Design a protein with these regions (language model features):
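Residues lining the SAM
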Residues: 109-111
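C-terminal lobe and adjacent flexible extensions of AdoMet/dcAdoMet transferase-like proteins
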Residues: 204-255
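SAM-dependent methyltransferase
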Residues: 140-212
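Conserved class I S-adenosyl-L-methionine
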Residues: 1-38
């Protein structure tokens, strides 16, 4: 699995302020309600700084958040203190996460599952999800497609805000289907000086068919795929796909 966010977590929300969390949360809520899930426990897998977790808590769900980055969870805890939501955050690797019981739904947003670099490990994640879902529970998640990584290619992205600046150097290997991005960022300190940090992250491109096969192998029922957070089916130009799957038994062995 790729490296978890470290120092960049301090400004993650600042530089990712273009992500429409509220809109996506409304979409997720509607899909869950269509399946009869209007309340109860919901797991946000790869919750990051807790932005989506907070939105779903606002919608009335009892939220659990799992993430492998202590720095990202620190930001999530700060949001929790502000909102007053009773959210349980767990510092765990999604490949080995453990819960105290089952949940009505699991969600995973913002490419979190693309950080799983091997299909065998993604299968293990799916089996864990299936294991911790209530009977008939729902799994809704998104992932970035190979088309997205091809479009980004070897681009360099730069941005600057009051809190700091960052440079994002991207490299995509179409043979290995691995996308690597090197983050160089400068965070402003209390003294007014800037400190330099560097992080490297990797994600894997999966096709919708690969995802469907792994879900079924994990024991889940594949229901639908959507072009991003819309009602349209995915196509060859889709850069983000949303998947809806359902628990249908615990017959598959955990490995």
């Amino acid at each position: 699995m790729a490296e978890a966010y470290g120092s960049f977590s301090e400004v993650y929300d600042t530089f990712m302020d273009n992500v429409p969390y509220r809109e996506w949360a409304g979409y997720i809520e509607e899909k869950l309600r269509q399946q009869g899930i209007e309340e109860g426990l919901v797991l946000d897998l790869g919750c990051g700084t807790g932005s989506m977790t907070e939105e779903l808590a606002d919608a009335g769900y009892d939220m659990i958040g799992v993430d492998s980055s202590p720095e990202m969870l620190e930001q999530a805890f700060e949001k929790k203190e502000t909102s007053g939501h009773d959210i349980l955050y767990l510092l765990q690797d999604m490949r080995e996460f453990e819960l105290y019981g089952t949940v009505r739904a699991v969600v995973s947003c913002c490419d979190s599952l693309n950080y799983i670099l091997e299909p065998e490990e993604l299968l293990r994640v799916f089996r864990l999800v299936n294991n911790y879902l209530d009977p008939g529970g729902m799994f809704l998640f998104d992932f970035s497609t190979e088309e997205k990584y091809r479009q980004i290619g070897e681009d360099t992205i730069a941005d600057s805000r009051e809190e700091g600046s960052f440079i994002w150097d991207n490299f995509y290997d179409p043979e290995e289907k691995i996308n690597q991005y090197d983050l160089t960022f400068f965070l402003r300190e209390d003294s007014g000086l800037y400190r330099k940090y560097e992080e490297t992250h990797m994600q894997r491109a999966y096709s919708a068919e690969e995802i469907k096969t792994l879900l079924q192998e994990a024991g889940m029922e594949f229901l639908q795929a959507f072009d991003s957070y819309s009602e349209e089916p995915p196509g060859t130009e889709s850069q983000r796909i949303v998947i809806l799957a359902r628990e249908q038994g615990k017959s598959k062995k955990m490995e």
